[in-house]
Regions:
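Short, well-ordered secondary-structure "scaffold" segments embedded in the functional core
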Residues: 1-167
């Protein structure tokens, strides 16, 4: 699982489990999640975004399921636009390193090292201003929605505050 930032570079990469492992599981096991659980106390520290496959938390914003008013629909539209930048970052990485597109045919421990190396080299290329490879950036990943019971009450309060204040 990779966590891209606004300029299509990656702030974090976790390459410990097979490719079929859901990103939300990988996130739950990540140091970033544990850091946010301990240290995220206010909205001014920012939030991260996820799709409906993630549980809503006070630091992790997810879309509303069947939004029933204009503000919630606009929130969802904006969240989707932000998520598309995540998919664009992953698309750029996979075009730059085509070995990542079709699956690596090496031992799992070597695959993890290759993935991390590709992410590091991608970030270096972005910092040096290397051209991006052309291609389709609109990658949509399917996810199974998380059970709403896993959403935190604090997360709902923060999401509602964001929707009501900014949309």
């Amino acid at each position: 699982m990779c966590k891209p930032i606004a300029d299509c570079k990656f702030a974090d990469v976790v390459a410990r489990w097979p490719g079929g492992t859901h990103d939300s599981f990988t996130f739950r096991m990540s140091e970033v999640k544990y850091y946010l659980e301990r240290n995220h106390t206010t909205l001014d520290k920012g939030v991260i975004i996820g799709d409906s496959g993630y549980a809503l938390k006070n630091y992790l914003m997810t879309p509303y399921d069947n939004p029933n008013d204009r503000k919630k629909r606009r929130y969802n539209t904006t969240l989707k636009a932000c998520r598309s930048s995540v998919e664009r970052s992953i698309g750029q990485l996979k075009r730059r390193f085509t070995c990542l597109k079709s699956g690596l045919r090496v031992q799992p421990d070597k695959a993890c090292l290759i993935i991390v190396a590709c992410v590091i080299l991608h970030n270096i290329a972005k910092m040096l201003g290397e051209e991006d490879f052309e291609g389709d950036d609109d990658i949509e990943f399917e996810c199974d929605p998380v059970d709403p019971a896993q959403d935190s009450t604090d997360g709902k309060v923060v999401r509602d505050h964001i929707a009501n204040t900014f949309f």
